[in-house]
């Protein structure tokens, strides 16, 4: 579901939940700027709920399609991604992004109720570490 539709920001927060729910306060821990927000959450949240390649591919297509629609609609320059899912699905999703055609993506690491740091996917070395 899309939130903050009237926002004038060129930043998009993408919250993907397949294992645990991502709470608003956790999203707020990565930025104090009002951003566009899109949430993807399965009806049933469980660890390793994505059972096969077809399910993973279907979910990835839905997510990437909606992200790209919003990127185009609002001229998004940076995607801030928070994910509560299996490592396997997280990497599978990441492989679907294009460094040529998609905007900058920062993926955040969750620890004890907050997303405390992130990795900017278009930077190298220590320049890639983002502390919100």
Report the location of each language-model feature.
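Long, low-complexity, Lys/Arg-enriched
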Residues: 1-80, 87-132
């Amino acid at each position: 579901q899309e939130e903050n539709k009237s926002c004038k920001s060129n930043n998009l927060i993408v919250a993907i939940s397949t294992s645990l729910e991502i709470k608003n306060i956790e999203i707020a821990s990565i930025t104090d700027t009002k951003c566009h927000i899109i949430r993807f959450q399965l009806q049933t949240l469980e660890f390793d709920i994505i059972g096969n390649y077809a399910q993973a591919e279907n979910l990835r297509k839905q997510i990437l399609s909606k992200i790209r629609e919003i990127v185009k609609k609002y001229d998004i320059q940076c995607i801030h991604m928070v994910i509560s899912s299996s490592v396997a699905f997280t990497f599978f999703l990441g492989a679907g992004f294009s460094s040529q055609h998609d905007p900058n993506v920062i993926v955040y690491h969750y620890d004890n109720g907050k997303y405390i740091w992130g990795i900017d996917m278009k930077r190298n070395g220590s320049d890639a570490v983002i502390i919100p």
